[in-house]
Each structure stands twice: as structure tokens, then as C-alpha cells.
A protein has these predicted regions:
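Flexible, gly/ser-rich surface segments that form the specificity/activation loops bordering the active-site cleft
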Residues: 24-29, 68, 108-154, 161-165, ...
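Canonical tetratricopeptide repeat
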Residues: 265, 299, 333-334
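Catalytic nucleophile loop of clan PA
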Residues: 55, 161-181
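N-terminal activation segment of mature serine protease catalytic domains
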Residues: 21-55, 62, 74, 257
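Alpha-helical segment of the N-proximal tetratricopeptide repeat
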Residues: 222-261, 265
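Conserved active-site neighborhood of the chymotrypsin/trypsin-like protease fold
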Residues: 47-49, 58-136, 151-154, 216-220, ...
Length: 342
């Protein structure tokens, strides 16, 4: 394994172990929100069934992912053991968001917050029905990435989810709905993405359509050439294909100079290819755009240690400890590994 691989491994190890120590919202709040998240079951034309989740967003209306209900011939929502039929949909196929009309639904309505106002390292949690379970399950994490798209942001978090949770809710610590569980990247070290609630709000006044309406592919299922850059960088980053990442991130930064993550991934590619001067410049640019970008501070700490400035590296650890203890621990371990290799 390369020295960079060791650094990446230590980061992932500490990341996974530290997640369990996150502060959780009160049981009372989670229990209250559980009632707002329902199970969805669909029947397909070939006789098979599919499962998903949905959140109550208005009277007789729930939001889910379009990929949950695509190509279905019937859709039902299960609420407190009652099976209720869906009579119509309001689809936004491109953004993978579908509102389902459920006449006679008796369930509390979620309070819709804001995705655009989320901050990096803000704590969030998800509620859905993964893996065929009968009761809703919650996962807890932090906001790790915000990717501007179509007047809002795609939200990447450290809170995981499984098959069947698609369409479930992501909530902030005040219980506001701030995202819709949607997709994860392939592989063991997956990235988890949520669609923004601003798109949900835009869909509320859309016209109703029949359940049998022909479905269309969402943006994330398009050909590679049509993917947003935030999707393109994942595989080369996780597989350490730095030349590919450098090329993609450079194009991203040119086309979207106001996107923090474009400069971050460019800096990581530069760091990994030993272009440390450019990496430091671009990491500082990331922090100028977002002072709580913990991964940028993490790599600046690595650069400080690499350049023999141990005191500055310790300062970066202290800085991280003020808002992201998990990443601070990652940096501590990475520095210890570097010192052991000398």
C-alpha cells in the first residue's frame, strides 16, 4: 500500500469508528418524526414487488424517489398497519422526486426546512425503511458535501442507508425535513446522497399524473458524459486514480469556480501527485470559501507535517477538535504514521 493509501486508510478507519460517538437527537423527537415517514410498496408489470420509503409533506401527499415507483402498475403506502392506495403522482423524473397522492392519509406532516442553508459538519439524521424491516430505522451523521445544482444543493452525508430507505427523510436536529434519501455511489466505501427539499417544494404545485405515466431516467442514471462533476470524481478518488481525478477536477474548477468541492478534489489530486505547492494554494482557497471544510484542514495538517512544521500540524488538529473530533483523530493517526515511517 502506498503512503497515501495508508493515510487514506487511517482516515477511513477513524471516520468509521468515530461515527458511533455522534450526539443523537432525543428519542422523543425521533419517535415523533417516525410517524411522518411511511413505507411504500409497488407492484410491477412483471409481477414482482418493490419497496421504498416516503415522507408526509402535505395533506394526502408524500414525497419519495421516482426510481421507487417507476414502471409500477400499483402503489400503496403503509401507515400504522393500514394499506392505502396511491391515486396519482407528481413526478420530477430528472431530479428523482415524485409526490404521491394518498387520499385519506392520516399522518403528521413534516416541517420542511432548507437544504441551501445547511453547513458542513452540521449533524443530521435519516429515517427510512431499509432492508425489508417493518419499523423505521434511523442513522446519524454529518453533512460532508454540498454540491450546487439547479438552484439548490445535493447533500452528501456520513449517515448511511440501505436498500428500501430510498425516499425516506433526512432531518436536522430541530426535526426539519432537509433532504430526501436517494442514492449512494458503488463500492464498499460508498458516498451517500440526498436530494434537496427546495426541489420538493417546487413540485407541490405540479399537475397530477396517472401512475402509469411513462417514467424517465434521473440525472444520476444518465450516461457518464452527462453526470455532474460531483459524481465523476468519486471513483477515481476512491481508487486513487490521481491522473484521472486531476483531469476531472481541473475541468470542474474551471466550469464551476464557485463550487468548493471542485477546488478540494483538485487539491487532493495535486497533493497525491506531489504538486504540494498548488495543493496548498487550493486547499487555502477551499477554506476561504468554507472555513469549516474539515477535510481541507486535514490535508493542510498533512502538508504542514510533511514540510516539517509539526507545530502548525498540531494547530490544525486543535482547529478540527473545535467542530469535528473524528477528523481531528484522523489527522492525529496520519501524523503518527508519517512519523513512524521516518
Amino acid at each position: 500500500m502506498t503512503s497515501y493509501g495508508l493515510t487514506l486508510f487511517s482516515a477511513l478507519f477513524y471516520f468509521c469508528t468515530a461515527i458511533t460517538t455522534l450526539a443523537s437527537p432525543s428519542e422523543e423527537l425521533v419517535h415523533k418524526l417516525n410517524a411522518q415517514v411511511l413505507r411504500v410498496q409497488v407492484e410491477l408489470a412483471n409481477g414482482s414487488y418493490g419497496l421504498g420509503s416516503a415522507v408526509v409533506i402535505a395533506k394526502d401527499q408524500v414525497i419519495t424517489n421516482c426510481h421507487v415507483v417507476a414502471k409500477s402498475i400499483s402503489i400503496v403506502v403503509i401507515n400504522n398497519g393500514l394499506t392505502l392506495s396511491v391515486s396519482a403522482i407528481k413526478p420530477d423524473w430528472h431530479h428523482d422526486l415524485c409526490i404521491l397522492k394518498v387520499i385519506g392519509l392520516d399522518a403528521p406532516i413534516a416541517k420542511i426546512g432548507s437544504s441551501k442553508n445547511l453547513k458542513y459538519e452540521q449533524s443530521v439524521f435519516t429515517i427510512g425503511y431499509p432492508n425489508f424491516i417493518a419499523l423505521p430505522a434511523s442513522t446519524f451523521g454529518m453533512v460532508k458535501g454540498l454540491y450546487p445544482l439547479d438552484n439548490s444543493v445535493i447533500i452528501r452525508t456520513s449517515s448511511t442507508f440501505g436498500l428500501g430507505a430510498s425516499g425516506g427523510g433526512m432531518f436536522d436536529d430541530d426535526g426539519n425535513l432537509v433532504g430526501v434519501i436517494t442514492l449512494k455511489s458503488p463500492g464498499k466505501e460508498a458516498y451517500y446522497y440526498n436530494m434537496p427539499v427546495e426541489w420538493v417544494q417546487s413540485l407541490l404545485n405540479a399537475p397530477e399524473q396517472a401512475i402509469s405515466t411513462k417514467s424517465k431516467k434521473p440525472f444520476w442514471a444518465a450516461s457518464y458524459e452527462k453526470w455532474p462533476y460531483f459524481m465523476r470524481v468519486v471513483q477515481p478518488y476512491l481508487t486513487e486514480n490521481w491522473s484521472s481525478l486531476l483531469q476531472i477536477a481541473n475541468k470542474w474548477a474551471i466550469q464551476e469556480p464557485n463550487t468548493t468541492e471542485a477546488w478540494y478534489y483538485l487539491a487532493i489530486a495535486e497533493y497525491a501527485t506531489n504538486d504540494t505547492q498548488k495543493a496548498e494554494v487550493h486547499l487555502q482557497k477551499v477554506l476561504a470559501m468554507n472555513h469549516q471544510h474539515s477535510q481541507a484542514i486535514y490535508y493542510l495538517g498533512l502538508l504542514a507535517e510533511k514540510n516539517g512544521n509539526h507545530a502548525l500540524a498540531l494547530t490544525d488538529i486543535e482547529r478540527l477538535e473545535s467542530f469535528d473530533e473524528a477528523t481531528a483523530n484522523q489527522l492525529k493517526l496520519a501524523i503518527e504514521l508519517k512519523q513512524a515511517q521516518r
